[in-house]
Regions:
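N-terminal mitochondrial targeting presequence
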Residues: 1-25
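Short amphipathic alpha-helical segments that mediate assembly, nucleic-acid/protein binding
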Residues: 3, 7, 27, 228, ...
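Generic recognition of cysteine residues
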Residues: 6, 14-16, 171, 188, ...
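TRNA-binding/sensing appendages of the translation machinery
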Residues: 20-130, 138, 166, 181, ...
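Positively charged, Gly/Ser-enriched RNA/tRNA-binding surfaces
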Residues: 34, 66-85, 95-98, 128-140, ...
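Phosphate-rich ligand and nucleic-acid binding surfaces
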Residues: 61, 105, 216-226, 237, ...
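Acidic, His- and aromatic-enriched active-site or binding-groove loops in soluble protein domains
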Residues: 109-119, 223-246, 337-338
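Glycine-rich, mobile lid/loop segments that gate access to catalytic sites or pores
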Residues: 206-217
């Protein structure tokens, strides 16, 4: 009814304003009426009913089960980072837009812009690498081994079933500083192997390539210098699109000569190990390109170090790997789960010139790093758990303090204090007189391994009952030795 009334009023107002004899005062009065109608419509019940309560596109909430899985994954990855001597930092969730632009190639269009009343032009961070480079330049840091886990934002078309979102966590490890060739790069590959192996994701492979080698290939094929980066962005799509589609984009959208595109196709189809390095060295046309020589020498050394680090079985030299971000300057790599459709679960490479873009004196700090795609990893693990019918514990409670009779809640609380003081994770029911079956059922449903059961008779004798929840085996222990006995049981 409100909308019908408003519509009639709008028609009346329009007739009045259309009149050739309308005065300024009448116009002001009718405008005031329209504003009042707008306010009424905004507060109307119909408008509220049409509001759909949901999260924005490309985002999601996380349940306790999902958060438990997430924290478990991050804990394992952080342990790997710390094992390799990394320290952690944090940076703002948004940056000056100028800091981010010109660093991501064609993906710059995916940056979220912000409006700021203070006059600064801002944007949500697209990744953690560019803010890290900005941090190094601002702080005058020339060497650091750091990890950073935080949310980033991309205005992408998400596919949440495949672990792709607009808001998601990145998990980065980077080594900054002037060091001997390929030593930090090889360690980054070792870190990827350790991390993915610790998570039991199944079989995976790490594809590696070198930006200098790619540039040498483009030059040998006849790609104009000013098209190197845009053609590189096309090659980067080969992990998602067949060669025919990529070739079509090169020729039709980027006006690359068909013969040149075909030459590129003959190279990017190659993959192998150190034997591929030797095969490419026999390519006379390619070896005339200094960039190609430089890239092959680096790849040979990297593969040697991979052998020493015992990761050769996980690494494949793949000429189709491009990684479209503009800031990469050397080795690049990407990890893929072989029996999953989620795409890459880790990627990175060397970016020696990024810090210099922010330094007033253009002083570069060589960097190499890896970003582990934890959102996609969560997606893989959630699917694994669902297919196996598994259940995730959402708490770390070790002991539940239960009572078998009424009016024992004070003693339950005293026992809890003793356990908490001993740094044992414990809880009780928040009812004064809970039923014993309900308490034990709570333990079983939540995976709590041990229950302490108290009763009037046992307390009078100075003992309590310890119950192993899984086996339902019970034994009595002295009340004054309870904490000691619980610690002993948990230790075993």
């Amino acid at each position: 009814m409100l909308r019908v009334k408003c519509l009639n009023n709008i028609i009346t107002t329009c007739k009045c304003l259309y009149s050739s004899t309308v005065t300024v005062q009448q116009i002001n009065e009718e405008v005031a009426k329209l504003l009042e109608l707008k306010a009424q419509l905004g507060d109307g019940g119909d408008a509220q009913q049409k509001f759909i309560l949901k999260t924005p596109k490309g985002t999601r909430d996380y349940s306790p089960e999902q958060m438990a899985l997430r924290l478990g994954v991050l804990d394992k990855i952080i342990n790997v980072f710390k094992r390799h001597g990394a320290e952690t930092i944090d940076t703002p969730i948004f940056e000056l837009k100028e800091v981010l632009t010109g660093k991501y190639g064609e993906d710059t269009k995916l940056i979220y812009d912000l409006k700021d009343q203070g006059g600064e032009i801002l944007a949500l961070r697209y990744d953690l690498t560019v803010p890290f480079a900005r941090y190094l330049a601002m702080s005058k840091i020339t060497n650091i081994k750091r990890y950073h886990i935080a949310k980033v934002y991309r205005r992408d078309n998400p596919s949440m079933t495949k672990g792709r979102y607009r808001e998601f966590y990145q998990c980065d490890f980077d080594i900054a500083g002037i060091y001997d060739s390929m030593l930090p790069d090889a360690e980054c590959l070792r870190i990827v192997v350790e991390s993915l192996s610790a998570l039991n994701l199944g079989a995976f492979v790490i594809k590696v390539n070198h930006r200098s080698l790619l540039d040498g290939i483009f030059a040998a094929c006849g790609v104009p210098n000013d098209k190197f980066r845009t053609i590189c962005s096309s090659v980067d799509k080969l992990d998602k699109s067949p060669w025919e589609e990529v070739r079509k984009e090169m020729v039709e959208e980027k006006q690359l000569d068909e013969a040149i595109a075909d030459k590129i196709g003959s190279y990017v189809s190659k993959r192998g190990d150190v034997k591929l390095v030797n095969e490419l060295r026999e390519d006379e046309i390619l070896m005339k390109q200094p960039k190609a020589k430089e890239g092959l020498e680096a790849m040979e050394l990297l593969l040697k170090y991979c052998d020493i680090y015992r990761v050769t079985d996980k690494v494949v030299f793949d000429l189709s790997l491009a990684r479209g971000l503009d800031y990469y300057t050397g080795v690049i790599y990407e990890a893929v789960i072989t029996d999953s459709e989620v795409g890459s679960v880790a990627g990175g490479g060397r970016y020696d010139n990024l810090v210099g873009m922010f330094d007033p004196k253009k002083k570069n700090v060589p960097c190499v790093g890896v970003s582990i795609g934890v959102e996609r990893i969560f997606s893989v693990l959630e699917n694994q758990i669902a297919s196996q019918g598994g259940k995730i514990r959402t708490t770390e409670v070790q002991v539940f303090v239960a009572s078998a009779q009424k009016n024992l809640h004070d003693e339950r609380m005293r026992i809890l204090v003793d356990l908490w003081d001993a740094e044992i994770k414990a809880e009780q029911s928040y009812k004064k007189n809970p039923k014993i079956l309900a308490q034990l059922q709570h333990c079983e449903e939540n995976g709590i391994p041990l229950a302490i059961i108290i009763g009037e008779g046992e307390l009078a004798k100075g003992v309590v009952t310890l119950r192993e929840v899984n086996t339902r085996v019970e034994r009595t222990v002295p009340r004054d030795k309870l904490v000691e006995e619980v610690k002993k049981w948990l230790g075993n």
